[in-house]
Each structure stands twice: as C-alpha cells, then as structure tokens.
Design a protein with these regions (language model features):
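Nucleotide/phosphate-binding catalytic cleft detector across ATP-hydrolyzing
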Residues: 1-10, 16, 21-123
Length: 123
C-alpha cells in the first residue's frame, strides 16, 4: 500500500488503499468531534506501508460545526494531526488533489467532495 484514502463522514469513517484493504467504521462524528484525530490515528496505525493520505469528506455538514468552513477546518486539522509526517492531499469538487492549506483557502470546494470523486471515476 502507498496511498490511503479516507472519507470522513458524519456517521462513518471509510478507508481504502484502492486494492484489497478497505473498511468502514460506524462513528457519529457529531457526538464527539474532539475524538476524530484519535479515531483516524487508529486507522492509520493499521494501514501497513502507508506513505500518503488522500481525504474526502461529508462530515463537515454535521450539527457539531457552526458552518461548512468550520467543519472542513476541524476535519483537516484532525487528519493532519493523525497523519503526522505523512503527506496529506485533499480532493476538491473541481477535481484537484491539493494540500490541506490550499483546501482551507477554498473550504466550499473541499466540502462534500466524495460524490464528485465517485462521479469522476464513473464518468
């Protein structure tokens, strides 16, 4: 494995290496957003040979965040904290994979990006 894809949703965290290692953990983000980094750290610790992380999200829409931008900010901070030194890329709805800093500059493009990633692959 080299890339690990994470989809941080409001009720589940899904992950895959795109080959054989895949999973989904039921987890209501809105109940304990402060535990997101720890949850992600556990997933990353089980990912053998992971050298980079790519992320999509819908969890920024959870009721625990006052706005989409606040949710994107918290989710990306949690992903980066969990990833440590691993490079993190964020999928945007314009089809680009960008750094967390670039995604934070355009949080609406990072918000609810998983549907676009799937549509792009299917199309």
């Amino acid at each position: 494995m080299s890339q690990l894809a994470l989809d941080v949703g409001g009720a589940h965290v899904k992950f895959s290496d795109g080959l054989a290692w895949t999973g989904s953990i039921p987890w209501p983000l809105w109940k304990s957003p402060d535990q997101l980094a720890g949850r992600l750290r556990t997933i990353l610790a089980s990912a053998e040979d992971c050298t980079a992380v790519a992320v999509t999200m819908t969890g920024e829409l959870a009721d625990c965040y006052p706005s989409k931008a606040a949710g994107v900010n918290h989710i990306l901070a949690s992903v980066c904290e969990a990833a440590g030194r691993l490079p993190v890329r964020v999928y945007l709805t314009d089809g680009r994979l960008v750094s967390p800093a670039a995604a934070l500059a355009a949080p609406i493009l990072a918000a609810a990006s998983n549907w676009h990633a799937l549509a792009r692959l299917a199309g």
